[in-house]
Amino acid sequence: MFLGEDYLLTNRAAVRLFSEVKDLPIVDPHNHLDAKDIVENKPWNDIWEVEGATDHYVWELMRRCGVPEEYITGSRSNREKWLALAKVFPKFVGNPTYEWIHLDLWRRFNVKKVISEETAEEIWEETKRMLPEMTPQKLLKDMKVEILCTTDDPISTLEYHRKARETIKDVTILPTWRPDRAMNVEKSDWKDYVKKIGEIYNEDTSTLEGFLSALWKSHEHFKEHGCVASDHALLEPSIHFVGEKTARKIHEKVFRGKELDPEEIRDYKAFMMVQFGKMNQETGWVTQLHIGALRDYRDSLLKTLGPDSGGDISTNFLKIAEGLRYFLNEFDGKLKIVLYVLDPTHLPTIATIARAFPNVYIGAPWWFNDSPFGMEMHLKYVASVDLLYNLAGMVTDSRKLLSFGSRTEMFRRVLSSVVGEMVERGQIPIREAKELVKHVCYDGPKALFFG
């Protein structure tokens, strides 16, 4: 039965295990929500605004089905965009987006219709009547979201995180320090960015010393607002020892308007990652490394819509073990590190790294892997090579508030099914299985990130 009680639960033990975790609070240490939207607490106007306006998963699949861009990110009305989505939605079967959006519709709106061209108008009207009462803060409470960490640039004022702390009682909203722009020295806007953070923190960032001082001040500012983790996007980690003298020369070269060669770019990024590690060591933050996403691969999307518009891909040819070796040894036992890999063929590398370094944790199946298939494969491999008990937990990685419930439910069901299979095969006693799924879903990630 579609989305029935046994959805994704493939054995009797899984049903028992899911009953232990389905109502646990949600702790999400990595997502892309905007704290401003939560604080202002404005309701959505329509179902497209809820499900399609910010979701590049939806955009990509609509493009795959031949929907013109004007019905995705263009000038068409939200109603026209929803109707265009509904028309092609049956083609999404097998992709987790098909299940997520139906779960949103069935669980949050109690509108138990299958999305199609025929039902699109009814769904539009039914949800539109309900949306005035479905504010962001109410939804977060209804979905039992206890803690969420947004992703924020070091130049952020964190004004809305402060307001959230003062005014919102049911959910804790914390920032995450994401200093990618600070280390992307090859980007054309890097120098302007460096000047801006200098203006904010009253430092002469044309010097390396001033730039590092400004970053330390930003780090402290985030700490004062409850930050517990940093987040870093690394296409391919290449972290090696680089002295401050070398980094200073590179920094000054950019400010003189000179172009860097590839080795200088790698050296500067490596130097900065080590500095970020030292900052996190000082504050006890978790360091999250997202590895293997090749950003903005489709040039036309980047030019017309900008980044984060559905043009990113996964790439395989990475030297993760070699690229992380210096960083992992430099911070051995000093820093909690979570590794997320986009290509599942790299899972053996990070799983064995985690076995070698007790301070390293394996992150959740991420981005293109957060489907039932991807999660099952990930969980089974981690359980067999490392410790499933030590998994860093579930992250939504979402730009869409409504998907917190659906993505978390899918993960908990798949986890229950995987562990339930072990019970059915006689590998685990049911009592230990119950403790395991509860730990992975809630106790473990809460302890790792929030102490």
From Swiss-Prot:
Q: A Pfam family this protein belongs to?
A: UxaC
GO molecular function terms noted in the UniProt entry: glucuronate isomerase activity
Please provide the record's keywords in A-Z order: Isomerase
**What is its pathway?**
Carbohydrate metabolism; pentose and glucuronate interconversion
Q: What Gene3D superfamilies is this protein classified in?
A: Metal-dependent hydrolases, uronate isomerase, domain 2, chain A
Provide the E.C. number(s) assigned to this enzyme: 5.3.1.12
Query: What protein name applies here?
Result: Uronate isomerase
Source organism of the structure: Thermotoga neapolitana (strain ATCC 49049 / DSM 4359 / NBRC 107923 / NS-E)
